[in-house]
Regions:
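Short, conserved structural micro-motifs that define repeat-unit consensus positions
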Residues: 9-12, 22-23, 288, 414
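Alpha-helix N-cap/N′ positions at the starts of helices
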Residues: 4-8, 32, 106-113, 132, ...
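Short linear X-Pro dipeptides
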Residues: 4, 10-18, 119, 126
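Short amphipathic recognition helices of helix-turn-helix/homeodomain-type DNA-binding modules
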Residues: 1-6, 11, 28-31, 35, ...
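Internal alpha-solenoid helical repeat scaffolds
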Residues: 82-334, 340-354, 360-367, 443, ...
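Helix-coil-helix junctions within alpha-helical repeat/solenoid scaffolds
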Residues: 177, 303-311, 315, 325-590
Length: 590
């Protein structure tokens, strides 16, 4: 029977795992048995103040564990742990009277304890455990719509499978909004804004109407987010502001241009700094880093990534550590540090996923799709996409084919492994759905991958009949993203490449090499931060120069091809190097 209600055990377990320490190791350092410490972590034994002090010292918790331990001979509620935003709101819920009596005393204390334990579980990645605590808080607050709304907001912060909609949570959010109807207090107004922001994001999670909740698809979610942002007061509560900006940015991610998304992220970072919440600070830093990358501001993103690394170290959050490592791997792939990326992707991330999946119940698809995307891109960069079809990775890609970006990626893999006819068939099926893509967000990397397929088919030759009808559509869809932007796959997973280069290879396939060269000149700005990307760009430039023709074009093309070949050799990009050597061996071919 669980007797611990203050979150000490959950926080102890989270910090121990974050420190990379086994249960036996910690037990030895704090002079108690492994079995007793296990029961403390599971909430079946109450820790003494002395044990809490020892654990705090060994794990360098800076008083956080001692603060959670009950004083000797008392059952006092410990001081709050800042495990996430909303702690202030959880401690100041003003409940309406219930049967003539205010909902205070033990009910209020238990509600706060359950929310705090849920926050600790959430930070540790224990999503099912967090849901259990939040659900208990919700049920215990029956008759108190404001408290129940706070509990449902916490539930809505949990990670969920990408591209899928949580229909039960949608119903809970709508139910809380209905219950607050008629409550004219300032607190209720803030809760309504937060609930609507989460509702908007959850509606927008669907990648298409096929995975949406009835008629409430992603476009409806984006519209609700826009309306909610419009009603957000400039001088309102910072917690409400942080929550609304966080959720509404995600809800509108696929429906607003990357520069507009960066503006929202910067507003969130300012609000999070005022709120001084570790949860929102992490959300803000990751949002800013993502949008800086999408806007081609690589060096600014490097600075933000450094801040996020410090945040992950300070909070000891398992989820923050996962996001920090995936962001590091993304940057390793961009800069050509393929060995470092491979160590994370094929070794460390697998351990991390198994740990989180087995012990913490994080939605596995959220983790596996991120790893899958990074594994795919590493294989592509190294010219090893054939391994995709000899491992279980191809099956994983096919299982996620409801995401168009995976269908586009599979078509590209087929083309780059010599299966051009099969790749063309899959490509045409994917292009048939382009009109259903949102205007931004995940649509951009999908379109860039489709442009890469066009380039592969164009270089192979013999596919003019397949390409001619679809090139205008692809060019029109990518045109709004031309410039210095970079297509970012995932949230974040990989940088697929400059959008201007994708526009250029489409122009080249359409028989407009001069236009292609203009696009390639724009693509050079974001590509300068990545030697592997520069090598790909020079190959594309060489092909365009040859097609333009004229005096000096062939020597210029040869120079570009040799530069691309040197870059490919330096970074072990065997497929790219083979393409360069093939074109060098056939003067005039483009």
């Amino acid at each position: 029977m669980v007797i611990e209600h203050d979150g000490f055990g959950a926080e102890l377990r989270r910090r121990r795992i974050a420190a990379g320490m086994s249960l036996s190791e910690l037990a030895g350092k704090v002079y108690c048995s492994r079995s007793f410490l296990s029961r403390v972590e599971n909430g079946r034994r109450r820790a003494s103040l002395e044990l809490a002090q020892l654990c705090d010292e060994v794990l360098d918790a800076k008083g956080a564990l001692v603060g959670l331990a009950p004083l000797p001979g008392t059952d006092a509620v410990p001081k709050a742990v800042r495990g996430g935003a909303g702690e202030r709101a959880a401690g100041t819920v003003k409940s309406p009277e219930r049967d003539g009596r205010s909902a205070v005393g033990p009910d209020r204390a238990e509600f706060r304890r359950l929310l705090r334990r849920g926050d600790l579980s959430h930070a540790a990645g224990e999503m099912r455990e967090a849901e259990r605590h939040y659900t208990a808080a919700y049920r215990g607050a029956e008759g108190d719509p404001r408290a129940q709304a706070e509990a449902v907001i916490r539930m809505a912060r949990r990670w969920s499978d990408p591209g899928q909609v949580d229909r039960e949570l949608l119903q809970s959010l709508r139910g809380c909004l209905a219950a607050l109807d008629g409550d004219g207090s300032a607190e209720a107004a803030g809760l309504r804004l937060r609930l609507e922001a989460h509702l908007a994001k959850k509606m927008a999670l669907a990648v298409s109407q096929d995975t949406a909740a009835g008629l409430a698809g992603p476009a409806e979610g984006a519209r609700l987010a826009e309306e909610t942002l419009r009603r957000l007061p400039d001088d309102g509560d910072d917690e409400v502001r942080c929550e609304v900006l966080t959720e509404c940015r995600w809800a509108r991610y696929d429906f607003m241009p990357a520069p507009e998304s960066l503006t929202l992220s910067e507003r969130l970072r300012e609000a999070a700094a005022r709120q001084d919440s570790p949860y929102f600070r992490g959300e803000a830093l990751m949002a800013v880093a993502i949008d800086q990358l999408r806007n081609g501001r690589i060096f600014s993103a490097l600075a933000t990534a450094n801040q996020y690394r410090k945040h992950a170290a300070d909070t000891h959050s398992v989820l923050a550590r996962w996001q920090r490592h995936t962001l590091d791997a993304l940057l390793d792939l961009w800069h050509g540090r393929f060995d470092a990326a491979a160590e994370w992707i094929f070794v460390e991330s697998l351990k991390f996923i198994e740990l989180l999946r087995a012990d913490y119940a994080v939605p596995a698809d959220n983790l596996t799709q991120t790893r899958l995307g990074q594994a795919y891109w590493l294989l592509r960069q190294q010219g090893r996409l054939a391994e995709l079809f000899t491992s279980d990775l191809a099956g994983d890609v096919e299982r996620h084919a409801y995401f168009p970006v995976w269908r586009a990626g599979l078509a590209l893999a087929l083309c780059e492994t010599g299966q051009h006819a099969e790749g063309a068939d899959l490509f045409l099926g994917c292009v048939a759905d382009v009109d259903r893509f949102p205007p931004s967000g995940w649509a951009v990397p999908a379109l860039v991958l489709l442009a890469e397929v066009c380039a592969a088919l164009d270089l192979e030759g013999g596919f003019d009949a397949e390409l001619a009808p679809v090139l205008p559509t692809l060019r029109a869809r990518l045109a709004p993203h031309d410039g210095e932007q970079i297509a970012l796959g995932g949230w974040p997973t990989v940088l697929v490449g400059p959008t201007a280069r994708a526009c250029g290879v489409l122009a080249l396939a359409a028989g407009e090499p001069e236009t292609a060269l203009e696009h390639f000149r724009r693509a050079a700005v974001p590509a300068r931060s990545s030697q592997p990307e520069l090598a790909r760009l020079r190959l594309a430039q060489a092909r365009a120069v040859r097609r333009v023709g004229g005096p000096g074009s062939e020597p210029n093309a040869v120079r570009l091809l040799r530069e691309a070949a040197r870059g490919a050799e330096s970074y072990g990009m065997t497929w790219l190097g083979g393409q360069c050597e093939g074109l060098l061996g056939e003067p005039g071919r483009a």
